[in-house]
Amino acid sequence: MKKIKKIFKELRYALYLSVHPFKGFWDIKYEKEGSLTTAIILMVLTAIVQIAGDLGTGYLFSGYVSANYNMLDTIISFLFLFFSWCIANWCLTCLSDGKGTFKDIVMFTAYSLTPYIILRTSMIVVSNMFILREQVFYDMLNGLSYVWTAFLLVSGMLTTHHFTLKRTLVVLLFTIVGIVVIAVLILMVFAMFQQVVSFASTVFDEFMLRVSY
């Protein structure tokens, strides 16, 4: 019961952090106002909200959703973006003398998703109430969710790693480049793996054919 109360307290603190980011991220790192468990919960909520948005957004604002929509694809895409961001940021901050550990990066990244969770949920609701002429308000919420989350990510990097604003922005830029590099490497490894499997399958088929004779 105490652990559940602690998690709810940390989730409430995520709301506080969203409007007081510098103090919030400082307290998470040094005053233990957050935990990895709560960070994982926020990640799960983000994935759920993303799926709910894909499936539950009003038809006037959702566009076309395939009948073959696969929730697993959405989850994998989110996890890839999340962890490739964390890995790239960790590698760069190690090189640039950042003070945050990989756990710290995972935590401030997850906590930065709080506005996205709230605003995305609001967008699902209003999309089923608004008419097309009110799309400007829907688009404003959409834009605000990304801008607010990006601001928290920058604030989290600056506070966690003890960077200046200039260094934070430089590391942010190279973190994005790092995500692209990770994606390319994964695609290359996947392509090579496919070729190896195809070659092994061909050799096996040839071997079985010769054995049968």
What do the predicted segments below correspond to?
Residues 6-103:
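Selected alpha-helical membrane-embedding segments in polytopic membrane proteins
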Residues 1-10, 177:
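Compositionally biased, charge-rich terminal segments
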Residues 19, 28, 72, 105, ...:
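Generic signature of intrinsically disordered, low-complexity segments enriched in small/polar residues
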Residues 89-184:
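Hydrophobic alpha-helical transmembrane segments and adjacent short intramembrane/lumenal linkers
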Residues 8, 22-25, 61, 78-83, ...:
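Phenylalanine-focused residue identity feature
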Residues 52-77, 123-146, 183-213:
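Membrane-helix interface segments in multi-pass membrane proteins
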